[in-house]
């Protein structure tokens, strides 16, 4: 068997998430269906580095899969890309070692979250940015987001009832940009891993701080108390993008560890 690693992007609007689910359209199901056609009708299982939820998008999701023979990687990429549905793009395919695992090999993820703060909202962005109809002071959020950087127990920012025991993660970079011409806030988080709904909960909290309904110090309070009830609401998934995944063997990996 030959193992392949692929970078994929997708518009999550019409998917019930990445991972295969019964009676639901998923990214995994669509790619596996295409690979089966390319593999003479034999099943191929793919593994994903991140399990994005319903409505969540990706520019840089990474998958791996095995095929019974070596293939030209560009021909394989082209075949997959042209036969997958239009809302999935196969960006790159490469052959990797048999022990490579896209989820368990050490890596760094970057997520982006787009928030439309236009009044009125932009209906063309309804599937691609979460609308926030209340006024915000961006400088308050820029000050508060600094407290998320570092190694912390993010219990207060994960979904209640999660089964993950170790909730310590490291965020290497967190920032907010504002595209005035589009009324878009762009939140960017880079870290060694993120808990279930962590990014969406952090954004929901920062927006509440920006609106003045929580103090700038609330981030520190939540981290210290490890209490989800102290955080803001979970922002909707349509604004979330898995932007990039960098593995330990890639040159730029060390830049984030400094």
Swiss-Prot record:
It is an enzyme of class 5 (isomerase). Substrate binds at residue 111. The active site is at 53 (nucleophile). Homodimer. The keyword Oxidoreductase does not apply. The gene is truA. It holds the Pfam family PseudoU_synth_1. CDD domains: PseudoU_synth_EcTruA. Keywords: Isomerase, tRNA processing. Belongs to the tRNA pseudouridine synthase TruA family. It catalyses: uridine(38/39/40) in tRNA = pseudouridine(38/39/40) in tRNA. This is tRNA pseudouridine synthase A. GO terms for molecular function: RNA binding; tRNA pseudouridine(38-40) synthase activity. GO terms for biological process: tRNA pseudouridine synthesis. Its EC number is 5.4.99.12. Formation of pseudouridine at positions 38, 39 and 40 in the anticodon stem and loop of transfer RNAs.
């Amino acid at each position: 068997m030959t193992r392949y690693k692929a970078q994929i992007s997708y518009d999550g609007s019409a998917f019930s998430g990445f991972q295969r689910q019964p009676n639901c359209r998923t990214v995994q199901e669509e790619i596996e269906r295409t690979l089966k056609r390319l593999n003479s009708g034999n099943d191929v299982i793919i593994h994903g580095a991140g399990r994005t939820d319903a409505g969540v998008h990706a520019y840089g999701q990474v998958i791996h899969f095995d095929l019974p023979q070596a293939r030209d990687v560009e021909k394989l990429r082209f075949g997959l890309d042209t036969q997958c549905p239009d809302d999935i793009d196969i960006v790159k395919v490469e052959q990797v070692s048999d022990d490579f695992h896209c989820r368990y090999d050490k890596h760094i993820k970057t997520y982006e979250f787009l928030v439309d703060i236009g009044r009125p909202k932009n209906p063309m962005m309804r599937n691609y940015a979460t609308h926030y109809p209340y006024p915000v002071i961006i400088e308050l959020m820029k000050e508060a987001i600094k407290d998320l950087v570092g190694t912390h127990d993010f219990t207060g920012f994960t979904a209640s009832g999660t089964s993950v025991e170790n909730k310590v993660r490291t965020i290497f970079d967190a920032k907010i940009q504002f595209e005035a011409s589009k009324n878009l806030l762009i939140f960017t988080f880079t870290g060694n891993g993120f808990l279930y709904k962590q990014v969406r909960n952090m954004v929901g909290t920062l927006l509440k701080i920006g609106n003045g309904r929580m103090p700038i110090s609330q981030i520190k309070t939540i981290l210290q108390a490890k209490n989800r009830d102290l955080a803001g609401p979970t922002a909707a998934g349509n604004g979330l993008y898995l932007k990039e995944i960098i593995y330990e063997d890639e040159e730029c990996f060390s830049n984030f560890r400094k």
